[in-house]
Structure formats: C-alpha cells, structure tokens
C-alpha cells in the first residue's frame, strides 16, 4: 500500500481557476491535497455551474480571508432569454417561457436600469444560511424561505455579445451580488424571462483570471513549482495602509499589549504591520485618541518568521 504524503504547514494564497461541475469546496479540497496542506479555505462560493477565479487561502492566509470576501467582483455571464429556470441557471428545469425576440435596444435599456445602487433578494438556490442550513436545501424540498432584500451596487453591465435569445454580459459589482438574480431582473424589465447558461468570475479584489491556475496545470507540477505559485498572505489586505514597527513594539503586539505609536494614519481602518526587515506581522488598529496600536489579526509567530 502506498503511504499518503504527510500533510504540511502551507501558508499563502492560490488563485485557482475553478472548473465547471465542481462545487467550490470540492475544488478547494482537490487543491489542498495537491499541496498536502494542513488547512485551507476559500473566499466566496462559486456555484458548480460557474467557473473562474476562486482564491484559496492556505494556513495563516485564512485569517485574512474575510477581507477578500468583502471585495468587489467581476463576472462574464451568458444568458438565455425567454425561459425561466427553477434554479435561475441551466441546472434547473424550465418552468416558464415568454418572448425571446428581444431587440438590442431593449436589452441595453434593461441593463442600464439595473446598473447602480439597487436592492436584490437573494435566490432560494444559494448558500445563504437559514437556521443553520443553506437555502438550497430548503429549495430542493420545495420550501420557500422569506429573504430580505439586500443593498448591492452594480458598477457596470457591458454587453459583450447579443444574438437573441443569447446574450453575454460583463458585470462589475459589489459583494453579495447574485448574477442569476440580476439576469432575471434584466429580463423582467423587458417583460420576459432569462436564466444563466454559463458564468465565469473574472476578477475579485484586483486579482484577475489571467493570474489563476487550473487543477490540471497544478497536478503537472512538482511541489517546489506549486509552492512558487503561492502569493504571500498579505496580498489579501494590500488595500489597507501599512506601517513599520520596531522589534520591541512587534513583541508587545504579539503578547496582547498595546505599544505606543504616533503616526498620521486613519483610526477607523485596519493597518498592515511589518517588521523593520519587511516581515508581515498582521493587522492592527490604530487607536489615535490614545496613540496606541491594538492587534486585530496576527500571523502565527512561527509562520511569520518563516
């Protein structure tokens, strides 16, 4: 019997190109096994139908994953106009039909109407939780749970291709935006139906699909080559301001103390903390009124020193 490779501490971010047909968790576990990593988590669920950018956080990077969940995203979506699906995408059954002879002008007007700050009701077929269970578990049993509308921002909808009943759009949006629901909203504005036949996440938090790696490509590399593709943990928080602390102040932070600090930094946002030799320590909060730094999320000392 062949012994399984031992799990090892891996710290960093992998930009994975999730294939169609796999759940986000299945793709995550495949990546974790390729790296023989002890711990891994992803930042934002993609439906099995969807493909594209899925940042995977190994080890200490998982501590900072939340800050990527809050980031804006971009997608390319393929719609079929004139048909409604039970799930909002091609995995469901067609449950209603209406006119599909939509003009480009009609479609453009509808896209413009759904651009900006809007309210969106999350779909039943989603991973949102109700009483500890994802909504899709209720939906599969025919149970409808009341969902509150959420405020989202659709920054832009660009029409990449249009040949009714097919339409391809590129969407830039805030976190929490459901492209299936957005597509249904566009169709509703025209007086018809629509569902997704393809969805690809192309950007998140400034990362692009061009930077990502497929599971197949990763499987063809050796361990050293794979490790070389990992991004450092601090890429997840690169949008925050940064500062440098001396070794004594860093030690105080790591011991739960609040070192004295005076610098012109905002007091209402996390701050990236580095040592004088450039090592990432973690995130801290600058308490400007008392000139102190308070630890928020810190790297494990051993991982930080590696």
Swiss-Prot record:
Where are the catalytic residues?
Answer: 47
Gene Ontology BP annotations = mRNA pseudouridine synthesis; tRNA pseudouridine synthesis
Q: Which GO terms describe its molecular function?
A: RNA binding; tRNA pseudouridine(55) synthase activity
The record's section on CDD domains has:
PseudoU_synth_EcTruB (cd02573), PUA_TruB_bacterial (cd21152)
One Pfam family hit: TruB_N
Enzyme nomenclature, EC number: 5.4.99.25
Q: Which domain of life is it from?
A: Bacteria
User: InterPro entries, alphabetically?
Assistant: PsdUridine_synth_cat_dom_sf (IPR020103), PsdUridine_synth_N (IPR002501), PUA-like_sf (IPR015947), PUA_sf (IPR036974), tRNA_psdUridine_synth_TruB (IPR014780), tRNA_sdUridine_synth_fam1_C (IPR015240), TruB_C (IPR032819)
Query: Keywords of this protein's UniProt record, alphabetized?
Result: Isomerase, tRNA processing
What catalytic reaction does the record list? uridine(55) in tRNA = pseudouridine(55) in tRNA
Key word Isomerase present: yes
Q: Which HAMAP family match?
A: TruB_bact
Describe the task this protein carries out: Responsible for synthesis of pseudouridine from uracil-55 in the psi GC loop of transfer RNAs.
- Family designation: Belongs to the pseudouridine synthase TruB family. Type 1 subfamily.
Recorded protein name is: tRNA pseudouridine synthase B
């Amino acid at each position: 019997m062949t012994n399984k490779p031992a799990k090892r501490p891996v710290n960093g971010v992998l930009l994975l190109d999730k294939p169609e047909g796999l759940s986000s968790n299945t793709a995550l576990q495949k990546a974790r096994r390729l790296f023989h990593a002890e711990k891994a988590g992803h930042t934002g669920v993609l439906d099995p139908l969807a493909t594209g950018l899925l940042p995977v956080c190994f080890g200490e990077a998982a501590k900072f994953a939340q800050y990527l969940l809050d980031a804006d995203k971009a997608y390319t979506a393929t719609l079929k106009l004139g048909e409604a699906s039970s799930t909002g995408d091609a995995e469901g059954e067609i449950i209603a039909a209406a006119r599909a002879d939509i003009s480009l002008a009609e479609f453009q007007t509808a896209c413009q109407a759904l651009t900006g700050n809007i309210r969106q009701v999350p779909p039943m077929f989603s991973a949102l939780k109700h009483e500890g269970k994802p909504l899709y578990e209720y939906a599969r049993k025919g149970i409808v749970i009341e969902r509150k509308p959420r405020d989202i921002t659709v920054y832009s909808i660009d029409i990449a291709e249009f040949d009714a009943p097919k339409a391809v759009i590129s969407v830039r949006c805030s976190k929490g935006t459901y492209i299936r629901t957005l597509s249904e909203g566009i169709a509703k504005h025209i007086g018809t139906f629509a569902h997704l036949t393809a969805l690809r996440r192309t950007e998140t938090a400034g990362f692009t699909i061009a930077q990502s790696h497929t599971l197949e490509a990763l499987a063809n590399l050796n361990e050293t080559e794979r490790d070389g593709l990992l991004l450092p943990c601090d890429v997840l928080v690169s949008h925050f301001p940064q500062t440098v602390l001396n070794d004594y102040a860093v030690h105080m932070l790591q011991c739960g103390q609040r070192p004295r600090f005076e610098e012109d930094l905002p007091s209402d946002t996390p701050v990236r903390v580095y040592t004088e030799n450039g090592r990432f320590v973690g995130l801290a909060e600058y308490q400007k009124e008392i000139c102190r730094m308070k630890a928020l999320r810190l790297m494990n000392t051993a991982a930080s020193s590696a």
